[in-house]
């Protein structure tokens, strides 16, 4: 699958310039494809993270008619059985980072994990969608740091005293759930060269 993509342009489905910047920075200049951001209105599917990622990727392929990379991110609170999970966008929109923190006010367990899933398609609907996942464990804290990138101000990864929002970009990009998923993607493309 990936061999047919080497040297080609892949549409990265996002309207978020910061997300594209972060992805390109993590992948580096050795990534064998060119990512081009395109904002596409995709339905907000419901279900498990893998199902949602596959459905989003298939719909993006239908609209783009070519190779696509779609990202879906979850923030899962252990005390809430994994919620908000794939619905974090809606929780964040209504509650902001402070409200996410307050959701756990009645719980001792503040642990959480961030899950990033990238879904890749060659653009051929008959070929399977390939998934790449990254997970970072941490805890939900009172928001600290810059408030301009989603829930970063209230997620503190395990082993760190800073939230994602307080970390220098390079440090965050070396430990984030997105980094781990993109590392899987890089390894997949790298295995073709071996």
Swiss-Prot record:
Keywords: Acetylation, Cytoplasm, Disease variant, Epilepsy, Hydrolase, Magnesium, Metal-binding, Nucleotide metabolism, Nucleotide-binding
Binding site for ITP: 14-19, 56, 72-73, 89, 149-152, 172, 177-178
GO BP annotation list: chromosome organization; deoxyribonucleoside triphosphate catabolic process; ITP catabolic process; nucleoside triphosphate catabolic process
Expressing tissues: Ubiquitous. Highly expressed in heart, liver, sex glands, thyroid and adrenal gland.
Tagged with keyword Acetylation: yes
InterPro entries: ITPase, ITPase-like_fam, RdgB/HAM1
pH effect summary: Optimum pH is 10.
Lineage of the species this protein comes from: Eukaryota, Metazoa, Chordata, Craniata, Vertebrata
Subcellular location: Cytoplasm
Organism: Homo sapiens
Domain of life: Eukaryota
Family to which the UniProt record says this protein belongs: Belongs to the HAM1 NTPase family.
Protein name: Inosine triphosphate pyrophosphatase
Modified residues (N-acetylalanine): 2
Main location: cytoplasm
Molecular function via GO: dITP diphosphatase activity; identical protein binding; ITP diphosphatase activity; metal ion binding; nucleoside triphosphate diphosphatase activity; nucleotide binding; XTP diphosphatase activity
Its biological purpose: Pyrophosphatase that hydrolyzes the non-canonical purine nucleotides inosine triphosphate (ITP), deoxyinosine triphosphate (dITP) as well as 2'-deoxy-N-6-hydroxylaminopurine triphosphate (dHAPTP) and xanthosine 5'-triphosphate (XTP) to their respective monophosphate derivatives. The enzyme does not distinguish between the deoxy- and ribose forms. Probably excludes non-canonical purines from RNA and DNA precursor pools, thus preventing their incorporation into RNA and DNA and avoiding chromosomal lesions.
Disease / disorder: Inosine triphosphate pyrophosphohydrolase deficiency: A common inherited condition characterized by the abnormal accumulation of inosine triphosphate in erythrocytes. It might have pharmacogenomic implications and be related to increased drug toxicity of purine analog drugs. Developmental and epileptic encephalopathy 35: A form of epileptic encephalopathy, a heterogeneous group of severe early-onset epilepsies characterized by refractory seizures, neurodevelopmental impairment, and poor prognosis. Development is normal prior to seizure onset, after which cognitive and motor delays become apparent. DEE35 is characterized by onset of seizures in the first months of life associated with essentially no normal development. Many patients die in early childhood.
EC code: 3.6.1.66
Catalytic activity line of the entry: ITP + H2O = IMP + diphosphate + H(+); dITP + H2O = dIMP + diphosphate + H(+); XTP + H2O = XMP + diphosphate + H(+); N(6)-hydroxy-dATP + H2O = N(6)-hydroxy-dAMP + diphosphate + H(+)
């Amino acid at each position: 699958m990936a061999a047919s993509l080497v040297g080609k342009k892949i549409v990265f489905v996002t309207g978020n310039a910061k997300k594209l910047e972060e992805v390109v920075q993590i992948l580096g200049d050795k990534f064998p494809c060119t990512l081009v951001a395109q904002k596409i209105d995709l339905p907000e599917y419901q279900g498990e993270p893998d199902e949602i990622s596959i459905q989003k990727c298939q719909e993006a392929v239908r609209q783009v008619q070519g190779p696509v990379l779609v990202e879906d991110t979850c923030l899962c609170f252990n005390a809430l059985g994994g919620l908000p999970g794939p619905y974090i966008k809606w929780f964040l929109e209504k509650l902001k980072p402070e409200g996410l923190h307050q959701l756990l006010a009645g719980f001792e367990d503040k642990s959480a994990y961030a899950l990033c899933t990238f879904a890749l398609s060659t653009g051929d609907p008959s070929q399977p969608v390939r998934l790449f996942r990254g997970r970072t464990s941490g805890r939900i804290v009172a928001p600290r740091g810059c408030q301009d990138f989603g829930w970063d101000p209230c997620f503190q990864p395990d082993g760190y005293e800073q939230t994602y929002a307080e970390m220098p970009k390079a440090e965050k990009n070396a430990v984030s759930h997105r980094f781990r998923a993109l590392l899987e993607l890089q390894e997949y493309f790298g295995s073709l060269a071996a």
